[in-house]
A protein has these predicted regions:
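Carbohydrate-active catalytic/glycan-binding domains of CAZyme proteins
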Residues: 1-233
Length: 233
């Protein structure tokens, strides 16, 4: 199953019996569109993230981002993230997508489960005031932040905000900074953040930054006692 964005206005899904294809479109239309209940006012219908829960044999889809108004308000709680349970066929949804009150959501959903806790992570937008703290956790613009919940369908509000997972690549001096896309994944009992930066491109072009991105991966540190997870590039 391959879930993808259709130019920011919907989520499609392809299926294949092999990762090398051939891939086919089983629906002939988008899985999520502006006509999907509770999705008509999502600014950007893109950046899908899917997680299969082996314990319950259930799948969940997270998506969305952006800000609806252009009046300078709504950056702190744009309410443009959505989560929904997938059908057993994984090409349908069960119920209405739920609104996520994700602090300063910009884009870039990732979802995983550690123990009995769900970890939703995302890229914050470019309008986070300096010194912003939620639940005692500091973060900045275009950081990868995360929230936790015991239920994949929430409620997801600022009460579930858990902190910064991965600081912006600019503040880490990896490159000149920019928005990011990532995934938090588990492999053989360890956790990793897969993300993009322009570090390799800068090295190859004599220090020049032309905004070419390459994929990188670093191991994350998971504290079992506190449930905190952090990563440095």
């Amino acid at each position: 199953f391959l879930y993808f964005a259709t130019t920011g206005s919907g989520i499609g899904v392809l299926t294949a019996d092999s990762p090398t294809g051939p891939w086919t479109d089983p629906l002939g239309k988008e899985l999520i569109s502006r006509s999907t209940p509770n999705c008509g006012n999502v600014a950007w219908l893109f950046d899908p993230a899917v997680y299969y829960d082996e314990e319950t044999d259930e799948d969940y889809l997270f998506f969305g981002g952006g800000k609806n108004s252009n009046d300078g308000t709504g950056y702190d709680n744009p309410k443009t993230g959505r989560c929904v349970k997938l059908g057993k066929d994984m090409i349908s949804i069960e119920g209405t997508p739920q609104t996520m009150e994700t602090p300063y959501l910009f884009e870039d959903s990732s979802i995983t489960k550690i123990g009995d806790t769900w970890y939703y992570s995302y890229c914050s937008n470019w309008n986070v005031p300096s010194g912003t703290s939620i639940n005692g956790q500091l973060f900045n613009s275009a950081d990868i932040c995360y929230m936790t919940s015991k239920n994949p369908l929430g409620p997801w509000t600022k009460d579930q905000f858990a902190g910064m997972l991965f600081a912006n690549t600019g503040s880490q001096k990896i490159d000149n900074g920019g928005n990011n896309h990532h995934s938090l994944v588990e492999f053989k009992g360890k956790y990793y953040v897969i993300y993009h930066s322009r570090q390799q491109e800068i090295r190859m072009n004599g220090g020049k930054d032309r905004n070419y991105r390459s994929t990188q991966i670093n191991e994350a540190v998971f504290d079992q006692a506190t449930g905190k997870i952090t990563c440095k590039g």
